[in-house]
Amino acid sequence: MKIDTFIFLMFISIGILLLLLNIINPMEVFHIVEWKTIFSLFYLMVIINIMRDTKFLDYISLKILKKSKRIFIALIFLTLFLSSLITNDVSLFVIIPLTLIIHRYTNMPFKDLEKLIIFEGVSANIGSGLTPIGNPQNLFLFHFYNIGTLEFIINMIPFEIFGILAILPFLEFKKYDTKINIDIKFKKEWIFYILSFILVLLCVFGYLNFIYILPLILAILMYKRVKVDYLFLLTFIFLFVDIEGLKRIGIINIFSIKCGNVMLMIYASLLSQIISNVPATVLLSHLYKNWLPIAYGVNIGGNGTLIASFANLITLRLSNGNVRVGRFLLIGGIIYIMHLIVLVAYAKIFWV
């Protein structure tokens, strides 16, 4: 069993146990779950995955890459950009396979390929921290704390800037000889998916009711074979059940410590290393009123251990054996520590 599947099933099992023990009545689940977050994730998964499956994301990526010989840097910044718009997980499903294809048409050494794939994983975690739709934890915080879109992005800019500065010294700026002869022609069906994506964004940001475009999403699922990670969605639903159950039996208070904003950021980042950043986000949001230290902490904490972020597991899974686990942990750990130290210094100066 894959480690991410094991983690998902563990959280689901805890929720089922809480229901069986009648700590939570099954009828209460509807009111406990943050359905805005669930529907946001579901809609984004459907639209973004179909854009990926129909090669629209490959089309955009290749258009950008064909204009650059500095493939290493181009792919890293493409990852940073895409992960802020289409989530860190999906961006990796586009970028890493594309990287492996492009590698065949370059003179890039395998050690640089390994380094590139690792930093694509790291960059996906950093880039996704900028926007409410960049990753599941941001999407949850966005709805749970009722944060404005612009407010969220402006507050996360320092996180993004210092994250990019942390990885820059390690990147390869040299040029590689490239002969990218892959050609993808524009498809008319993409226009429909682009418009659907815009409608989904309007829902996520509160301009449209989620019910209005549910028929559209269901129609797409009926007529197209779209891969949706239903296990992840189910896990997210049960996370709300888990947290409510732990709150009722008093265990959640174990995770509550008296701390200021800077210490909360550090705490959130460390907790993410142990239980992964999505569960850490849901847990801490029920204990603390200030969203920003949690957002910084869980996004910093995405890099480091394998389970810190699901994006880390995806990076290794997609690398086709080109990445050593030890090397991945070393680089991820170094970036985590550097990013945390710099943001602690920033927070001590600018946070009240």
From Swiss-Prot:
Lipid bilayer topology: Multi-pass membrane protein
Ranges that cross the membrane: 6-26, 30-50, 76-96, 151-171, 197-217, 226-246, 291-311, 330-350
InterPro entries: Cit_transptr-like_dom
One Gene Ontology cellular component annotation held by this UniProt entry: plasma membrane
Keyword flag Membrane: yes
One example of a Gene Ontology biological process annotation: transmembrane transport
Keywords on record: Cell membrane, Membrane, Transmembrane, Transmembrane helix, Transport
Localisation: Cell membrane
Highest taxon above the source species: Archaea
Major subcellular site: membrane
Similarity annotation: Belongs to the CitM (TC 2.A.11) transporter family.
Name by which UniProt lists this protein: Uncharacterized transporter MJ0456
Organism of origin: Methanocaldococcus jannaschii (strain ATCC 43067 / DSM 2661 / JAL-1 / JCM 10045 / NBRC 100440) (Methanococcus jannaschii)
Lineage: Archaea, Methanobacteriati, Methanobacteriota, Methanomada group, Methanococci
